[in-house]
Swiss-Prot record:
InterPro entries: GTP-CH-I_C/QueF, NADPH_dep_7-cyano-7-deazaG_red, QueF, QueF_type1
Residues where substrate binds: 62-64, 81-82
Keyword Transmembrane helix: no
Molecular function via GO: preQ1 synthase activity
Keyword Cytoplasm included in the entry's annotation: yes
Species of the source: Frankia casuarinae (strain DSM 45818 / CECT 9043 / HFP020203 / CcI3)
Protein name as it appears in the record: NADPH-dependent 7-cyano-7-deazaguanine reductase
Reaction catalysis annotation: 7-aminomethyl-7-carbaguanine + 2 NADP(+) = 7-cyano-7-deazaguanine + 2 NADPH + 3 H(+)
Compartments, as annotated in UniProt: Cytoplasm
Amino acid sequence: MALTKLGNPEAKADRSLETFPIDDTSQEIRIDCREFTCRCPITGQPDWATIRIDYRPGGRGLETKSLKLYLETFREEGIFHEHLATLIRDDLVAALAPVQLTVTVNFNARGGIALAASSTYRREA
């Protein structure tokens, strides 16, 4: 698969994720996304979060510009925090076919309450 977003100033936000071959499947890879925003599905108010992605590759690595553009698509979307962690996990698993992958979404406090949601995938042996 050719990388079409990296180095392309015309690349637009969409839900496609690009990957590249990676030989060392013993690696543990961590990606922190510190500027995530979406909206409350009830009030429409903005929510801010940090998203952490930890994965052991199954032969594919995640190209991070495509991840950035993917995450931008949620900016105006109303979604419950718990649903977001699972949706991102499912999309990443479909793109990467990893050995293991965990998505943790840490939302900033609202009304004095902070919420974190994690969703994990493990390939069956």
